[in-house]
């Protein structure tokens, strides 16, 4: 701790909370350092420490000041925030695609022995049933459609900094127009979901949505993201929503 304070300053815990550091991450960093390490210049007065063959850079820049070189903690915190948002948003895109795949798989079988194929109206099944996309399985049993993905849930119900909700209908801006996905109390006419950041600007910025069409849309809902998402009951990617090109490709524009 004394060494950390000498190197990073009194606020070292903000960038290196020792009680939260994963031992495996430390080992990976040491191996990368032993493979290769260098300083990458960003102008004349700033350098970044890079390690490994891929030159992963420590988010804490080393800058030149009046008394010499030092780690710039404020800029480092901002770089860490940007990286965290990027990681969470990429994870959310993959998670919402996994939701799409899970719903398609779920509807391939009659999950409640009523002779009908349907989509799941909830993510986690009621104990002892298969009415959701995830359920506990015993050793040797097939995984549920969402499988081990649910193992990374946070205690508050989020996943990689995002909340999720299943939507049971769509609005006028969706392909096919407005209609409910419910036939009776079963969701058989389609499915959709929306994901939004738990802490806007910190855990994420963009919100994401997908339906049975398989096109992932994104939108920056702004500072009122939590309120807007709480009021969202329909899949309706209208003004302000655009396809995620990295996932969907140009063909999504015509859907």
Regions of interest found by a model, annotated:
Residues 12-59, 153-160, 165-173, 178-187:
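Surface-exposed, charged secondary-structure patches
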Residues 192-239, 243, 254-255:
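C-terminal soluble interaction/assembly domains
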Residues 1-11, 117-120:
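Short, well-ordered alpha-helical segments enriched in acidic and aromatic residues
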Residues 4, 22-25, 58, 92-95, ...:
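Stable alpha-helical elements in mature extracytoplasmic
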Residues 47-50, 54-88, 215-219:
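Short beta-strand edge/turn micro-motifs at domain boundaries
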Residues 19, 52-55, 85-96, 110, ...:
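Solvent-exposed, acidic/flexible segments
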Residues 80-115, 122:
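Surface-exposed beta-loop interaction hotspot
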Residues 106-204:
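Flexible, glycine-rich surface segments
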């Amino acid at each position: 701790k004394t060494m950390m304070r000498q190197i990073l300053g009194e606020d070292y815990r903000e960038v290196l909370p020792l009680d939260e550091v994963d031992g495996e991450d430390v080992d990976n960093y040491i191996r990368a350092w032993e493979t290769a390490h260098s300083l990458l210049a960003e102008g004349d007065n700033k350098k970044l420490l890079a390690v490994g063959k891929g030159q992963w850079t420590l988010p804490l820049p080393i800058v030149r000041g009046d008394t010499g070189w030092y780690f710039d903690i404020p800029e480092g915190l901002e770089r860490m925030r940007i990286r965290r948002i990027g990681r969470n948003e990429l994870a959310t895109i993959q998670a919402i695609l996994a939701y799409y795949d899970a719903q398609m798989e779920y509807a391939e079988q009659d999950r409640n022995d009523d002779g009908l194929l349907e989509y799941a109206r909830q993510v986690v099944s009621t104990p002892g049933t298969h009415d959701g996309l995830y359920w506990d399985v015993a050793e040797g049993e097939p995984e549920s459609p969402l499988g081990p993905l649910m193992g990374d849930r946070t205690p508050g119900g989020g996943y990689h900094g995002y909340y999720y909700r299943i939507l049971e209908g769509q609005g006028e801006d969706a392909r096919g127009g407005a209609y409910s996905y419910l036939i009776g109390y079963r969701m058989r006419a389609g499915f959709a979901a929306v994901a939004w950041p738990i802490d806007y600007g910190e855990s994420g910025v963009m919100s994401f949505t997908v339906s049975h069409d398989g096109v992932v849309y994104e939108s920056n809902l702004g500072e009122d993201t939590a309120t807007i998402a709480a009021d969202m009951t329909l899949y309706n990617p209208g003004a302000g929503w655009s396809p995620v090109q990295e996932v969907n490709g140009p063909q999504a524009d015509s859907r």
